[in-house]
C-alpha cells in the first residue's frame, strides 16, 4: 500500500517530541464515497453518494458485486444522495441495517433494509421499510449521519433545510425535525417508537418527540466516543466559522445555537433565547488558509497506535488538511493533501481509522510514526553541509539500527535509508532543490529532526 506522510508539528530548525501521521492508500476506484463503517466484522462498507454501497475486504479489494444499489430511489448531486449507513447492534442475528438518503423530491429518508438470506455480501433491495420521511425546503444542508449508541437507539443528525442563514429558522424550531439530533427506537412493529426519555416526548411538551438536541446548521458527520460518553459533532458554518461540538449522550435537550450563533459569534439573535441557555463549541476554526467546510471524524480508540489515543480526527474539505483535536481542545493541522477532498472518516471493527476523498474515490488508512527524544542529545548530532547539494554527512549517531528519512515541506517522504555511517556521505543528488526535514529514527519512537536545505 502506498504511504503518504503528513507531519503535523510546526517544524523549526530543530524539533523533538513531535508527532506524524501516515495515510496509507487502502482502496481506490470508488465513486463519491461519503460514509465508511463496519458490521462488526472484518469488512468495510462504503457508501457512495450515487446510491450504491460497496464492500471492501481486509486486503483493500472491492467486491465486484454491490452490497446495495438504490440509485433509482435517490436524487444524486450537490449535497444530496445516499449519505448515511448504520448496522443494527444485532445485525449478525437480524440482518437489519439503516440508510439515510434524499428521495427524488429531495426529502430526507431514513429506511431499514435487510441482508440477503443466502448471501452475506448482498442486501435484499426489496426489503425497504421507511421509518422517516422529512420534507425540506432547499437542496442543500441535508445532514446525513446515523449511528447506534450503546442504548440501542438510532441517532440521526439532520441539516437545517438549506439556503443561507436558515431563513425558516428550522434549527431553533423545536417542532421541526430539521437542524436536529434525533433519537428513535427502531425495535418496533411500526416504523419506530419514541424513547420515553427523549426531552420533548409526551403530550403537552413543546417540541417534536423525536428530538434529542437542536440548534445545528449542517452537521456533516458525527460519531460516538464511548470512552468519554460524548457524541462528537462537526457542524459546517455559514461563511466564517467551522465548529466541533461535544454532546454528552446522557444530557438531553441541548441547544447548539444556530442560527443565533455561528460558532461563538453572534449571527442572528432576533427572537433567540438567552445566550446562557446555549451550548457552545469546544473548538472552532476560521476560513484562513483556504479552509471552508469541516468533515467530522472519530476519536481514535484503537490499540495499534497509542500516540493517537484520545485524539479527535476531522478534516477541512477545501484545504485538504486533516485536523487533530487534543484533550485540551487544541487543533493541529497536517499539511494539505492536494487533490483529495476528504468527505468522511470511518472505523473498522478493531477501531482502526480510515478517511475517504470524495473526488479521487480513494480510501486511506490513518497510521502513525511517533517521534520521541533520541538517546543522543540533539547537540551531539551534526548534519552537514547545510545547505547541501550532492551529499549530506551525519555525525553523532549512536544507534546502529537508526534509519534516515527526508521529508519535503509538503509532508511527502522523498528518501529513506538505513545505511547511516558516521562521517560517510549520503547521496541526495536526485532530490530537487527545496526545503526539507531530515529525520533520524531509532525504532518507532525515538528521533532527531532538523531542517535541511537542498540547493
Language-model features: locations:
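Short, compositionally biased serine/threonine- and acidic-rich segments at solvent-exposed termini, linkers
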Residues: 365-371
Amino acid at each position: 500500500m502506498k504511504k503518504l506522510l503528513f507531519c503535523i508539528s510546526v517544524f523549526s530548525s530543530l524539533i523533538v517530541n513531535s508527532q506524524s501521521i501516515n495515510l496509507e492508500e487502502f482502496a481506490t476506484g470508488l465513486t463519491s464515497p461519503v460514509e465508511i463503517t463496519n458490521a462488526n466484522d472484518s469488512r468495510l462498507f462504503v457508501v457512495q453518494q450515487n446510491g450504491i454501497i460497496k464492500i471492501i475486504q481486509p486486503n483493500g479489494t472491492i467486491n465486484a458485486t454491490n452490497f446495495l444499489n438504490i440509485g433509482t430511489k435517490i436524487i444524486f448531486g450537490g449535497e444530496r444522495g445516499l449519505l448515511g449507513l448504520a448496522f443494527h447492534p444485532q445485525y449478525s442475528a437480524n440482518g437489519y441495517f439503516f440508510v439515510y438518503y434524499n428521495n427524488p423530491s429531495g426529502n430526507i429518508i431514513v429506511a431499514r433494509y435487510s441482508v440477503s438470506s443466502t448471501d452475506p455480501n448482498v442486501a435484499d433491495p426489496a426489503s425497504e421499510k421507511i421509518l422517516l420521511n422529512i420534507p425540506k425546503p432547499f437542496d442543500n444542508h441535508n445532514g446525513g449521519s446515523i449511528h447506534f449508541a450503546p442504548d440501542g437507539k438510532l441517532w440521526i443528525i439532520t441539516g437545517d433545510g438549506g439556503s443561507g442563514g436558515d431563513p425558516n429558522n428550522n434549527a431553533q424550531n423545536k417542532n421541526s425535525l430539521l437542524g436536529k439530533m434525533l433519537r428513535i427506537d427502531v425495535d418496533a412493529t411500526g416504523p419506530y417508537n419514541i424513547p420515553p426519555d427523549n426531552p420533548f416526548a409526551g403530550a403537552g411538551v413543546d417540541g417534536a418527540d423525536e428530538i434529542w438536541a437542536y440548534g445545528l446548521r449542517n452537521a456533516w458527520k458525527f460519531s460516538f466516543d464511548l470512552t468519554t460518553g460524548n457524541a462528537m459533532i462537526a457542524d459546517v458554518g455559514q461563511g466564517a466559522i467551522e465548529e466541533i461540538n461535544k454532546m454528552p449522550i446522557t444530557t438531553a435537550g441541548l441547544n447548539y445555537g444556530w442560527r443565533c450563533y455561528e460558532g461563538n459569534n453572534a449571527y442572528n439573535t432576533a427572537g433567540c433565547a438567552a445566550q446562557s441557555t446555549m451550548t457552545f463549541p469546544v473548538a472552532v476554526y476560521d476560513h484562513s488558509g483556504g479552509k471552508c467546510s469541516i468533515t467530522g471524524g472519530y476519536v481514535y480508540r484503537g490499540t495499534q497506535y497509542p500516540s493517537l489515543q484520545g485524539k479527535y480526527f476531522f478534516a477541512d474539505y477545501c484545504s485538504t488538511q486533516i485536523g487533530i483535536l487534543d484533550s485540551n481542545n487544541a487543533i493541529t493541522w497536517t499539511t494539505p493533501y492536494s487533490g483529495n477532498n476528504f468527505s468522511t472518516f470511518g472505523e473498522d471493527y478493531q477501531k482502526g481509522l480510515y478517511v475517504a476523498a470524495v473526488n479521487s474515490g480513494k480510501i486511506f488508512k490513518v497510521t502513525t510514526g511517533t517521534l520521541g527524544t533520541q538517546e543522543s542529545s540533539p547537540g551531539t548530532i551534526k548534519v552537514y553541509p547545510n545547505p547541501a547539494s550532492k551529499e549530506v554527512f551525519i555525525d553523532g549517531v549512536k544507534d546502529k539500527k537508526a534509519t534516515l528519512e527526508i521529508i519535503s515541506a509538503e509532508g511527502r517522504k522523498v528518501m529513506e535509508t538505513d545505511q547511516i555511517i558516521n562521517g560517510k556521505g549520503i547521496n541526495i543528488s536526485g532530490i530537487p532543490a527545496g526545503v526539507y526535514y531530515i529525520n533520524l529514527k531509532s525504532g518507532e519512537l525515538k528521533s532527531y529532526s532538523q531542517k535541511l536545505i537542498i540547493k
